[in-house]
UniProtKB/Swiss-Prot annotation:
Cofactor(s) the record lists: pyridoxal 5'-phosphate
Protein name: Molybdenum cofactor sulfurase 1
Enzyme class: transferase
Cross-referenced InterPro entries: Aminotrans_V_dom, MoCF_Sase_C, MoCo_sulfurase, MOCOS_middle, PyrdxlP-dep_Trfase, PyrdxlP-dep_Trfase_major, PyrdxlP-dep_Trfase_small, Pyrv_Knase-like_insert_dom_sf
Keywords, ordered alphabetically: Molybdenum cofactor biosynthesis, Pyridoxal phosphate, Transferase
Entry's transmembrane regions: none
GO biological processes: Mo-molybdopterin cofactor biosynthetic process; molybdopterin cofactor metabolic process
GO function term, MF aspect, one: lyase activity
Catalytic activity of the protein: Mo-molybdopterin + L-cysteine + AH2 = thio-Mo-molybdopterin + L-alanine + A + H2O
Organism: Aedes aegypti (Yellowfever mosquito)
Active site per database record: C394
UniProt-listed Enzyme Commission number(s): 2.8.1.9
Lineage: Eukaryota, Metazoa, Ecdysozoa, Arthropoda, Hexapoda
Free-text function comment from the UniProt entry: Sulfurates the molybdenum cofactor. Sulfation of molybdenum is essential for xanthine dehydrogenase (XDH) and aldehyde oxidase (ADO) enzymes in which molybdenum cofactor is liganded by 1 oxygen and 1 sulfur atom in active form.
Residue numbers of N6-(pyridoxal phosphate)lysine PTMs: K228
Length: 764
């Protein structure tokens, strides 16, 4: 077992160093989502760019030279899979999904033919059910498929049916015996009489780090995506068709380049004879296809073949061993009460490279055995610069099987609001998905150690806490104290520092006047936030309502004064469009001078400051209330009593030199309305709120992200208090409530919020 806990690289020292030098752009980031896409090497992209700069690549319908080059690429791809064009035709597509769709549309079933698919298949396989040319559609369980290896039935009928299964499951990396291909082609499937089956192998996950030998195993169809292997180019895949199965494909649609003749006035056409020419509609992505040559060259240079092992086989060895190291280290983690820290979702124990690929799937458990939500784990990982994948990974069957969810459970979770890709990770304490880490040829042992360190730091309690909290012994907050509005905070520039008001402040139809009215965008017009540039918090705007000026300050720089009234002069307006929280927003460019000041302050060239246009009408989802450039509501209310309660729950601030003050913690939550109530967390029960004479509706809780871990006074990131929120609320990353003004004036009259106003929360 001790040997299983260690990792020995399959590369030489020189090879490992050369590979590491190719990925210096990762800097401090730990990338563990190679099943999503692997990474391209620096030299690979330089070589691609040099080829584009030095050569003239014409449309292949124009230039025979380009067409010949594409044929070279086809030959190179087929050679990678140890086959040739006399055995397989290679049809370029936009990826595995497009290949599966093309097959589903084109496969000609016999009258009694069946479409059979493994339940543990990618969503793209499930989608084939909607368009295949048969109504006999059946899922097959993993155990049933594996039993086919021992089946003795024989089929002599013509091929009439189609089965699809993966060579490797993208959920947890388990590999399926490729002997199944020949067995099913020859003998059919138990329970389907004498039907003969064509076999489609979904090889997308498998070929990323494993050798598919098409001279030994010959599926009728193979689907794959090239970015899984090389990282670049994206949007390019292939459908490989065995020559014996070509006649079973009947394509209806035809595009440019696929016909011998087509008439405009009559419905008449004749398709080309070669399969590839019939199926590749229009102009291929020829520059992307040519770039595959650099992909092969890069892999073979960085991981050269050795005696008896191809490049891809050496990569398979490396990723398997690093996956086994990760699996065993996670399996060994224990809380102080000896309970497991991790629940693994696997069909093997990483004993055999032929049965397991480089993917590890798991959930994290609290000390009492309850689940940590995958969304929380994702947040914490991002704080530690770890990139991993969470959810169900577009494989609902494998997810359902490993999480032990019945169909009724899945529908119940859907009715409770959970949909694919959301952060609704726990429902009634049960996980809706999991955490996946996956490995490529450039993954290092240090990347796994980084993951382990994060889990140990955030989730393993080395001692069981005893004693009372400060909240239990501090009694200065009396039950008869009335809740008050302590402070108003507005953020004139989205994701920059707060402007704090302790007197009064006017409202507008969008919320607090001037709140999140401006946004900083990069040279591509993309809105910046502290998630990308934490130093934004050091830019602190101040608004002078009387002079209508905004003063920007930053440590070490002279203040910059922006005249707000000049931004409305028609001759100075420069309308721009940017995207904020998935919304396209019309905005006014504030000019070169302030752009230069911001670029210097943030040490990033090409930044611009934009102001939301007064004519812009922006709402969130179904709400009728207008909002500025805030994420989803007009106001965010934060209760100081709740922040104080949360601070007491943080076991220690080991990443900081000293415990943060209450004020600095409140600042992290970037609320607009800072209140103080007698009881902590009572705001969670409110449905409506009155502050002074103004009434507000509660729009719901605020879902938190890693921004609350940024010290707004310094820009320094830590893991708290997000870690504690996830633990205390069982993975629900929520703190604070969103409000909207119920009766804003529309006639131009101003309404004001006053600090020290009485706050009344209504729960009905």
């Amino acid at each position: 077992m001790e040997a299983m806990m260690n990792f020995t690289s399959q590369y030489t020292v020189e090879e490992a160093l050369a590979i590491e030098n190719e990925f210096s752009r990762l800097k401090e980031k730990c990338y563990l989502d190679h099943a999503g896409t692997t990474l391209y090497a620096d030299s690979q992209i330089r070589s691609v760019c040099e080829g584009l700069a030095q050569n003239l690549y014409c449309n292949p319908h124009t230039s025979r030279t380009t067409e010949d080059l594409l044929d070279q690429v086809r030959y190179r791809v087929l050679r990678h899979f140890n086959t040739r064009s006399s055995e397989y035709s290679l049809i370029f597509t936009s990826g595995t999904t497009a290949s599966l769709k093309l097959l589903a549309e084109s496969f000609e079933f016999a009258p009694e033919g069946a479409f059979v698919y493994l339940k543990d298949s990618h969503t793209s396989v499930l989608g084939m059910r909607e368009i295949v040319g048969t109504e006999r559609i059946y899922p097959v369980e993993r155990e049933q498929l594996l039993k086919e290896l021992d089946s003795s039935e024989r089929s002599d009928n013509e091929h009439s049916s189609l089965i699809v299964f993966p060579a490797q499951c993208n959920f947890n990396g388990v590999k399926y015996p490729l002997e199944l291909v020949r067995k099913i082609q020859r003998d059919g499937i138990s329970g389907y009489g004498k039907e003969r089956f064509r076999v489609c192998l979904d090889a997308a996950s498998f070929v990323s780090t494993s050798f598919l030998d098409l001279s030994k195993y010959q599926p009728d169809f193979v689907c794959l995506s090239f970015y899984k292997i090389f990282g670049y180019p994206t949007g390019l895949g292939a459908l490989l068709v065995h020559h014996t199965a070509a006649d079973q494909l009947r394509k209806k649609y035809y595009g440019g380049g696929t016909v011998k003749i087509a008439m405009a006035g009559r419905i008449f056409h004749v398709k080309r004879d070669p399969l590839v020419e019939r199926f590749e509609d229009g102009t291929l992505a020829f520059t992307s296809i040519i770039a595959l040559l650099q992909g092969f060259e890069t892999l073979e240079r960085l991981v050269p073949s050795t005696a008896g092992l191809r490049t891809i086989e050496r990569i398979s060895q490396q990723t398997f061993h690093i996956g086994r190291y990760c699996y065993n280290r996670l399996k060994a983690l224990r809380h102080s009460n000896e309970n497991a820290v991790v629940k693994l979702y696997h069909d093997t124990g990483f004993e055999d490279r032929g049965l397991q690929g480089g993917i590890v799937n798991f959930n994290i458990l609290h000390e009492d055995g309850t689940y940590v939500g995958f969304a929380e784990v994702s947040y914490m990982a991002s704080l530690h610069n770890i990139l991993l994948r969470t959810g169900c990974f577009c494989n609902p069957g494998a997810c359902q099987r490993h999480l032990q969810l019945s169909d009724e459970d899945v529908l119940k979770q859907f009715d409770a609001g959970h949909v694919c890709g959301d952060a609704n990770d726990l429902i009634d304490g049960q996980p809706t998905g999991s955490v996946r880490v996956s490995f490529g040829y450039m993954t290092r042992k240090e990347d796994i150690d980084c993951l382990l360190e994060m889990i140990e730091k955030c989730y393993i309690r080395k001692t069981i806490a005893n004693g009372f909290t400060r909240t239990q012994i501090v009694s200065k907050y009396k039950s008869h104290d009335q809740p008050r509005l302590k402070m108003i905070c507005l953020f004139p520039i989205k994701s920059c520092g707060a402007f704090k008001v302790t007197t009064r402040w006017p409202l507008s139809r969008r919320g607090l006047k001037h709140d999140r009215e401006f946004v900083i965008v990069d040279e591509n017009g993309v809105a910046l936030t502290q998630k990308k540039l934490a130093e934004m918090c050091l830019i602190r705007p101040q608004i002078n309502v009387k002079t209508n000026e905004m003063t920007l300050s930053h440590p070490g720089m002279a203040d910059f004064v922006l005249q707000l009234d000049l931004l409305g002069e028609s001759q100075r307006i420069k309308l721009c469009q940017t995207k904020v929280c998935q919304d396209n927003v019309q905005a006014i460019d504030c000019g070169d001078q302030v752009a230069e000041w911001i670029s210097v302050a943030l040490q990033t060239s090409g930044l611009r400051l934009l102001k939301q246009s007064d004519e812009e009408v922006r709402t969130f989802q179904q709400s009728k209330q207008e909002i500025a450039l805030a994420n989803q509501a007009q106001f965010l209310l934060i209760n100081q009593a709740s922040v104080r309660w949360l601070a007491d729950k943080v076991p220690d601030w080991d990443e900081l030199h000293e415990e943060p003050t209450l004020e600095s913690l409140v600042d992290r939550f970037r609320g607009n309305l800072i209140v103080e109530t007698p009881k902590s967390m009572e705001e969670c029960d409110w449905k409506r709120v009155t502050i002074g004479y103004l009434e507000f509706a509660v729009d719901g809780p605020c879902s938190r992200c890693q921004m609350i871990c940024i010290d707004q006074g310094t820009g320094v990131k830590a893991t708290e208090p997000l870690r504690t929120i996830g633990r205390e609320f069982k993975g629900k990353m929520r703190f604070g409530i969103y409000l909207s003004h119920v009766n804003p004036l529309r006639d131009g009259s101003e309404q004001w919020l006053y600090c020290n106003s009485v706050v009344e929360g209504l729960s009905e």
